[in-house]
């Protein structure tokens, strides 16, 4: 039976709200004065470099910000106007805590949003956008809407970065004792945790609005293979 988009969304918001709420209570591992402190907040060097490159932009959006590590890095590298948004209240609480810890409250505005918030943003508002670990852990319908709206709200010279998890084939899933619903959706304990697509499938979803400038593969700490993806996109110019 097909899953309900709204039901999946509400379950996801509850899951991430609880996950990030637990982080608000423990920021003891973060020392803003330590060397490379903000670099260590990013899950990988590739993601750090992407966020840092947005420091030279005028107005940046960190969509699905989580604890807002990308927004923080962009601000610490020079961007004076960063918006960090997430539908999970716990994520925003965590983000605001980290933002205050680093003293960049005047540069970063973090707030909770609804799933249709992007539709309220004016055309060509941002010249930089980063969206990490979001598109492939939400219902595909919402992911495609985010891609469409992202093209509308960024300027012609904008740089966009989309970080994605690794591709999981049905065969690999089965070998690990898991099954993919509807061909590519992984649910764990009733929570949508992955919508698995190949590099080419993601490139095809971006293609109507964006050109792929680079595609990097990377690993999170502790992972042996660089299988996660980072797409650097540029908006296609009108013909």
Feature map (PLM): residue ranges:
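Class I (Rossmann-like) S-adenosyl-L-methionine-dependent methyltransferase catalytic domain
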Residues: 1-56, 66-118, 138, 142, ...
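A short, aliphatic-rich alpha-helical micro-motif
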Residues: 54-55, 123, 147
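Conserved beta-strand/loop positions that form the S-adenosyl-L-methionine
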Residues: 63
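A short acidic, Gly/Pro-enriched loop at the edge of an enzyme's catalytic core
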Residues: 120-129
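A short beta-strand submotif of the Rossmann-like class I SAM-dependent methyltransferase core
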Residues: 131-134
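A short glycine-rich, Lys/Arg-flanked "PGG" loop and its adjoining helix->strand segment in the class I
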Residues: 144-156
């Amino acid at each position: 039976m097909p899953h309900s988009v709204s039901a999946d969304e509400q379950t996801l918001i509850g899951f991430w709200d609880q996950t990030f709420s637990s982080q608000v209570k423990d920021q003891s591992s973060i020392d803003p004065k330590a060397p490379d402190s903000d670099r260590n907040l990013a899950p990988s060097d590739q993601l750090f470099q992407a966020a840092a490159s947005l420091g030279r932009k005028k107005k940046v959006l960190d969509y699905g910000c989580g604890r807002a590590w990308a927004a923080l890095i962009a601000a610490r590298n020079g961007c004076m106007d960063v918006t960090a948004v997430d539908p999970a209240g716990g994520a925003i609480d965590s983000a605001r805590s980290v933002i205050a810890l680093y003293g960049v409250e005047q540069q970063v505005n973090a707030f909770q949003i609804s799933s249709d918030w992007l539709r309220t943003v004016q055309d060509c508002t941002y010249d930089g956008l980063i969206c990490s670990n979001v598109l492939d852990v939400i219902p595909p319908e919402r992911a495609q809407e985010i891609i469409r709206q992202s093209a509308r709200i960024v300027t012609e010279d904008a740089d966009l970065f989309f970080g994605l998890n690794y591709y999981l084939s049905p065969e690999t899933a089965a070998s690990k004792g898991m099954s993919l619903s509807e061909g590519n959706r992984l649910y764990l304990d009733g929570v949508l945790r992955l919508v698995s697509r190949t590099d080419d499938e993601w490139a095809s979803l971006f293609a109507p609005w964006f050109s792929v400038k680079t595609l990097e593969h990377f690993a999170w700490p502790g992972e042996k293979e660089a299988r996660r993806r980072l797409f650097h996109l540029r908006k296609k110019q009108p013909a």
